[in-house]
Amino acid sequence: MAKKSVSVIAAKTAVHAAVLAPIALLGWQFWQVWQQGSDALGADPVAEIEHRTGLWALRLLLITLAITPLRQLTGQAVLIRFRRMLGLYTFFYASVHLTAYLWLDLRGFWTQIFEEIVKRPYITVGFTAWLLLVPLAITSTQGWMRRLKRNWGRLHMLIYPIGLLAVLHFWWLVKSDIREPALYAGILALLLGWRVWKRLSARRTTARHSAPPPATPR
């Protein structure tokens, strides 16, 4: 048991390091641009920051959604221990993405911010996805699970429309080459399709077991 706990801690440490590496690299490159005027972030540093943080938010969202199918396929219940961590990192990257847009792109002009959210559909769906992530991040603790009971599971089903909104945000944002958003849309479709299939299979199994036995001829 102790050896298993140590291996889980080591795995979590590795996941923390892997997930924080992109933001650490981005921070280092931003510092180079800010202090030295380098081109580490390309010709448009703000757009690059927004793109990378948004992309990692979407990737981590899909990885979080993949935890349950992976557990069901492999039988490794320990994978569930990583789901909350990855979900919170999804919210972190999404929040950095939104902050970069508000403060680096729009420079905190609130009137323009509200106009952009209302007028541009891809911003509307992206902002909506972030808003829906907020209650999931707040209620991700064991304490909230106990308080909300069954409603906790119902609330956290918001992750599915959030995934759809996030992919739609990326799809609408891309102007020409849609191969990358199409790839993420395909992954999301597989993950959601798996859940639908498992639920239908469970219902069929339950119906089969609850059906009365056939009458024996007399």
UniProtKB/Swiss-Prot annotation:
GO terms for cellular component: plasma membrane. It is found in: Cell inner membrane. Its cofactor is FMN; heme b. The keyword Transport applies. Keywords: Cell inner membrane, Cell membrane, Electron transport, Flavoprotein, FMN, Heme, Iron, Membrane, Metal-binding, Transmembrane, Transmembrane helix, Transport. Pfam families: Ferric_reduct. Heterodimer of a catalytic subunit (MsrP) and a heme-binding subunit (MsrQ). This is Protein-methionine-sulfoxide reductase heme-binding subunit MsrQ.
